[in-house]
């Protein structure tokens, strides 16, 4: 086991604080509408330019191991805020730095760290309740666009495209961000349920221009097994032919004689038909077939529940207004399922999301909710260069997370104003002893730090602005982009309540741990063994 370097008390805390300040000072320059850029060197390719706090934090690794421990703990604050709300990473870092600096001053003055931490925790719990009381719902498109704009460093085009995407696919829809090919941002919306399985034979194509299969008002047969014998399909085919409507078959696979017969029937115009494989694998395939059944008002023909394909009738088939199938994807538009059943299924999947432990499972379940509830929108980010593309994509993703958080828990006045209003309501809060009171004051003072940093980055006098905002009431605050004092919500400067709340909670949690640190242990660097001396070629002298 390698030897360790151990430091205690103030010696340990000073080193840790140095690391905290190095990381936080690099991150906090990005805060606010006039936040600066940070350039990140990459081992290959062009450097990355970013205003995203968590991207800056993730790049920082310090040579001094004790300083690095402090930096890594603040990095954890940014990462947790990012995971919980998708934004607010810089705010969380600024809050953590302020609490740690103020808290460690009190510890150095002889205060009991445990009581300080209890005081900080009391203040934060009360502040979170105040933030919830200040919160207003964020339902309309204008408010969503404003939240997106603020999160994307005052880029209104980003806010507007996110609001448009949310309007089209609903609050439950999936919105993804991709790198586009054009200079402008583009929005692609897929209505209905789309899954990544294309037609099983190109002979099903009936739209030669687009190379796709278009079925209007089709029946949809859902089968949880492979179909290779055409005799199993005959009763359904005869019923569909009599109804003079097209048929989509979604099965584990359709092969051999069954596929050949379907192709021949389609080409002769006897039955307009297309077949695709069911999406997913294993249990996920069964679940997705059931989703399609509920969306279209049909039944999954499965021998597990005693249903046989030969005995299927038209009542067992789903229906939709239109189905479009390409080589890679199938889209079912306007399924005929019962809305109450669809909402019940969505609620059931949401419960599974709550219980899921892996991010992959959560993502897949969220996709299923979107396909049932709304649709899928893809924002294609446009930029002139690759460097700009990466920077803009980061901002769009942040803004998207922020708008989701705003829809979820509402919004508060932005620009650090909500934290100042929450702190002013807690001026009468007292702890169990004087040291807890100091902890409460540490937290309340730290809650001014985001506003001060926004003002500082804008090149204005932070103390003057902080005093003016503190003297105001309600949503009165300072617009750092224009230098104007007014109602922040009316000016469109909003922060999602969830983002502000998460930033404060995570910052206080990690800062509390750092304040109560009494010893730090790290491995001593290994000393390289001395190189072997050059032996030469002794005893060979005199040779010509």
From Swiss-Prot:
ATP binds at residues 30-33, 51, 87-91, 415, 479-481, 495. GO terms for cellular component: cytoplasm. The keyword S-adenosyl-L-methionine does not apply. GO terms for biological process: protein refolding. Keywords: ATP-binding, Chaperone, Cytoplasm, Isomerase, Nucleotide-binding. Pfam families: Cpn60_TCP1 (PF00118). Belongs to the chaperonin (HSP60) family. Forms a cylinder of 14 subunits composed of two heptameric rings stacked back-to-back. Interacts with the co-chaperonin GroES. Together with its co-chaperonin GroES, plays an essential role in assisting protein folding. The GroEL-GroES system forms a nano-cage that allows encapsulation of the non-native substrate proteins and provides a physical environment optimized to promote and accelerate protein folding. This is Chaperonin GroEL 2. The lineage of its organism: Bacteria, Pseudomonadati, Pseudomonadota, Gammaproteobacteria, Vibrionales. The gene is groEL2.
